[in-house]
Amino acid sequence: MGQKINPIGLRVGIIRDWEAKWYAEKDFASLLHEDLKIRKFIDNELKEASVSHVEIERAANRINIAIHTGKPGMVIGKGGSEIEKLRNKLNALTDKKVHINVIEIKKVDLDARLVAENIARQLENRASFRRVQKQAITRAMKLGAKGIKTQISGRLGGADIARAEQYSEGTVPLHTLRADIDYAHAEADTTYGKLGVKVWIYRGEVLPTKNTSGGGK
């Protein structure tokens, strides 16, 4: 089961938090579609800003958006000009008051989404699919990853028959729920068609904190 399921979805509510932090009785469907619209809009607007993921909180007529990015300067802009433009566009898109918080990702080579996107962009620039995977693995392990696995599938090197090639280093325990495993999928548009890129990064175990509020010694 751990081999097939999305590692992030399997761990939500155990060691990972939800990316949509709200609940609605009646308007759940419409608000969910609004969330999808916001996420798609941010991805399109900030294509070059290395956005990993977006968290959305709702309260009454207000939306709080946290953008996790490897390039916060590009999102904020000079004197906050870019983030102000983005806020105004989101206000118009949702017809609600939007507040944006930008959170910097310190180690971009330990973020699966950013690693997958980086591999995909290099493949589009005709880089060797073997070399880009090995380089990504080396960088992640140097930054302290416990394990990493990458896979590229499609018409590799322009071959007539599509296949998949994967490389890994360290351990990636997909069945262990306390294992902090980041996963992402990206696509590269090449002259031979699409290539799929998958990345799993094991960053160590997340142990539950002991609850000592009940007294005891």
Swiss-Prot record:
The protein's name in its UniProt record: Small ribosomal subunit protein uS3
Gene Ontology biological process terms, A to Z: translation
Keywords of the record: Ribonucleoprotein, Ribosomal protein, RNA-binding, rRNA-binding
NCBIfam families (alphabetical): rpsC_bact (TIGR01009)
Similarity comment text for this entry: Belongs to the universal ribosomal protein uS3 family.
Subunit and interaction comment: Part of the 30S ribosomal subunit. Forms a tight complex with proteins S10 and S14.
One annotated GO molecular function: rRNA binding
Organism: Staphylococcus aureus (strain COL)
Residue intervals of the KH type-2 domain: 38-106
Stored PANTHER family: 30S/40S RIBOSOMAL PROTEIN S3, SMALL RIBOSOMAL SUBUNIT PROTEIN US3C
Pfam families: KH_2 (PF07650), Ribosomal_S3_C (PF00189)
Protein role: Binds the lower part of the 30S subunit head. Binds mRNA in the 70S ribosome, positioning it for translation.
Cited InterPro entries: KH_dom, KH_dom-like_a/b, KH_dom_type_2, KH_sf_prok-type, Ribosomal_S3_C_sf, Ribosomal_uS3_bac-typ, Ribosomal_uS3_C, Ribosomal_uS3_CS
Any single Gene Ontology cellular-component annotation: cytosolic small ribosomal subunit
